[in-house]
């Protein structure tokens, strides 16, 4: 949606193929709705640059289009002295990435902000927030269609052939057709590998391996025990147990 919106606003003729019967029913709606600050990514990496700049653009967009969001801040918590060095490393990395609002907190300061958290210290990220991802997607869809972009639901790309002028897409669903295009953007999430494999002539060595990382989501009934997003020190590829809050 974001890519299609941007292309349509730039004056391109855009058709967005959606395999499902509605937008955002897969990975776009299965996340914590967090606007990240850009702390965790290696310095000067593409992810770090995009996250820091994207955060600013997303807050700006939400303000302009009345998309519900909130800068509630995030605590990265050290629960033992042995984790202090990791917290300091994250602080240096975040600062190097351009996250200029990070603050180190001692145990008493953490307790004052979050009475239900026991910690040795924490790193406080003021610019981390949450967004209503469903409302954001609907806003993107509105922008796309207002710019004469077309959203085609129940329209899987069953196969793609490379042509002299671009690509020919075999679109399935209830109204199958062939669509010719000069530009094809593969933004299919977990279906990315399968989509690339369906492009005739696409070299297999350029297709990345899909590795699943399972996540479990739980809903806590009643009032929240936290006032901010709270994250433990990350361990290898695991962010451990984190909390997110509903927008107030």
Regions found by a protein language model. Name each.
Residues 1:
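Residues forming the Rossmann-fold NAD(P)(H) cofactor-binding site
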Residues 4, 8, 143:
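Gly/Ala-rich phosphate-binding loop of Rossmann-like dinucleotide-binding domains
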Residues 8-30:
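Glycine-rich FAD pyrophosphate-binding loop
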Residues 33-109, 113, 119, 244:
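Dinucleotide-binding Rossmann-like beta1-alpha1 core, especially the glycine-rich loop
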Residues 41, 68-78, 101-104, 109-147, ...:
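Helix-loop-beta segment of a Rossmann-like dinucleotide-binding subdomain
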Residues 160-248:
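Flavin-dependent oxidoreductases
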């Amino acid at each position: 949606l974001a890519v299609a919106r941007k292309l349509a606003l730039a004056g391109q003729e855009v058709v967005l193929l959606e395999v499902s019967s509605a937008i955002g029913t897969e990975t776009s709606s299965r996340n914590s709705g967090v606007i990240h600050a850009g702390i965790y990514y290696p310095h000067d990496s593409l992810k770090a640059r995009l996250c820091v700049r994207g955060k600013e653009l997303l807050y700006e967009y939400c303000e302009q289009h009345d998309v519900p969001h909130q800068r509630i801040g995030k605590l990265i918590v050290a629960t033992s002295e042995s984790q202090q060095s990791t917290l300091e490393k994250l602080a240096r990395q975040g600062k190097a990435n351009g996250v200029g609002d990070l603050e180190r907190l001692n145990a008493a300061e953490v307790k004052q902000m979050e009475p239900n958290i026991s910690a040795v210290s924490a790193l406080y990220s003021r610019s981390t927030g949450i967004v209503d991802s469903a409302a954001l997607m609907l806003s993107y869809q509105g922008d796309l269609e207002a710019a004469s972009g077309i959203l085609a639901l129940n329209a899987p790309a069953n196969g793609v052939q490379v042509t002299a002028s671009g690509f020919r897409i075999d679109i399935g669903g209830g109204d199958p057709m062939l669509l010719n295009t000069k530009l094809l953007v593969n933004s299919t999430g977990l279906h990315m590998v399968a989509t690339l494999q369906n492009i005739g002539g696409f070299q297999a060595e350029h297709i990345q391996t899909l590795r699943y990382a399972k996540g479990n989501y739980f809903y806590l009934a009643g009032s929240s025990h936290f006032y901010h997003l709270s994250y433990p020190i990350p361990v290898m590829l695991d962010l451990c147990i984190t909390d997110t809050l509903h927008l107030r």
